[in-house]
Regions:
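Active-site entrance/lid segments in N-terminal catalytic domains of soluble metabolic enzymes
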Residues: 1-164, 168-169, 176-179
């Protein structure tokens, strides 16, 4: 079957998703703002049993997200009149979310066994941007013993360099074109 791609920003922990996928999941890594955070995520993925890691390199800089701006979406979330109207127009979703709690990224907490803090749930969108380079990929390759995929390759030259650096596959992507 097809593997599940599990994002660093997933609202379900990488361990839980792997359990539910019968072991057929790949972990998609966004480089964190610190090496410790990134290495912790890589170690957790390996310990959980992931056999494929996707390093996401197709968002080196953030572009304005016009749709999010138009809809009043902010991180961290702030309640505004437009959102209040949306909640009233979608009562089932609103009540379910209230009962279950606001979805939070479950993979970015560095300490096991605690809820992500409010700053972590906001996950600074600029964190880790521009940190990726070939040295970073080389270090990751030496840390990760299984299949490594580089996501965000846009040129034949970069694809060749990625293979030389030890990745098993390249994933041609511009992140939906919204980061251009």
């Amino acid at each position: 079957g097809f593997p599940l791609g599990v994002s660093t920003m997933s609202s379900t922990s990488l361990e839980e998703v792997l359990d539910q996928s019968d072991g057929n999941a790949w972990f998609q890594l966004y480089a964190g703002e610190s090496d410790a955070l990134t290495q912790g995520l890589v170690s957790r993925a390996a310990q959980a049993g992931y056999r494929t890691l996707i390093l996401t390199a197709d968002v080196p800089a953030l572009a304005p997200r016009r749709r999010d701006q138009h809809n009043g979406f902010t991180v961290p979330f702030r309640l505004k009149p437009k959102q209040l109207i949306d909640f009233c127009l979608h009562p089932r979703w609103s009540l379910t979310t209230l009962m279950r709690g606001i979805p939070k990224p479950r993979n970015i907490s560095v300490q096991e066994g605690r809820e992500p803090s409010s700053s972590e749930t906001g996950f600074r969108r600029e964190a880790g941007r521009g940190r990726f380079d070939w040295r970073f990929l080389s270090q990751l390759r030496s840390q990760w013993p299984h299949q490594l995929v580089l996501k965000g390759v846009m040129s034949p030259e970069d694809a060749k360099m990625a293979v030389t650096a030890g990745v098993e596959a390249v994933y041609v992507s511009n992140h939906g074109g919204r980061q251009l």
